[in-house]
């Protein structure tokens, strides 16, 4: 299905290690509003989406989120790859180091492991699209918080890129919601779920 290009969507070239920053940014790898959950959410939601154009959009964005996951992992890797033992101890990175050395492992900034309970697939068109729109806004807010903590332009620029893509995804999911509603009974979008109820004339 996929063709993998051996380059990032946006260049990441970090010169200075920073374990404290890595511990924050890793939340967008495996945290509650991170790229791992986003990719799994959209690539799972597409199967119960009966409208081809919307299912295609979920596939496109879910695929892009995998690229964003790779970017975040690269940022974390470059921030930690040249750490000295002293830097690990002083930065508070020791707890992570004990379990993972400097490997990239999915967790939130607070150390909570990635959990599939952080995202949902209800199999209901309206519910799932609202879930996706909310997810993009939460990710954007998280990137906003990260940007407030960054001084290194080598880190700031790729994070800005990722934040901008969350806004675009939010807008595209808004368009998808409109497309889905155009297919439904305009008098009551919640009368039935065409992803499950095979009766387009159902009304309440």
Predicted regions mapped to residue ranges:
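Non-heme di-metal
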Residues: 1-204
């Amino acid at each position: 299905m996929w063709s993998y290009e051996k380059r990032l969507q946006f260049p990441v070239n970090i010169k200075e290690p920073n374990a404290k920053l890595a511990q924050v940014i890793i939340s967008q790898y495996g945290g509650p509003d991170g790229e791992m959950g986003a990719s799994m959410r959209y690539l799972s939601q597409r199967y119960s989406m009966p409208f081809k154009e919307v299912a295609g959009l979920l596939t496109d964005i879910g695929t892009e989120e995998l690229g964003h996951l790779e970017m975040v992992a690269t940022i974390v890797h470059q921030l930690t790859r040249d750490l000295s033992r002293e830097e690990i101890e002083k930065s508070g990175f020791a707890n992570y180091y004990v379990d993972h050395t400097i490997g990239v492992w999915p967790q939130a900034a607070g150390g909570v492991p990635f959990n599939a309970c952080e995202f949902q697939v209800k199999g209901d068109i309206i519910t799932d699209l609202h879930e996706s729109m909310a997810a993009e806004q939460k990710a954007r807010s998280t990137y906003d918080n990260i940007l407030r903590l960054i001084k290194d332009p080598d880190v700031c620029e790729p994070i800005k890129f990722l934040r901008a893509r969350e806004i675009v995804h939010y807008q595209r999911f808004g368009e998808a919601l409109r497309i889905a509603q155009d297919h439904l009974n305009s008098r009551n979008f919640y009368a039935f779920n065409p992803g499950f109820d095979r009766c387009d004339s159902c009304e309440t």
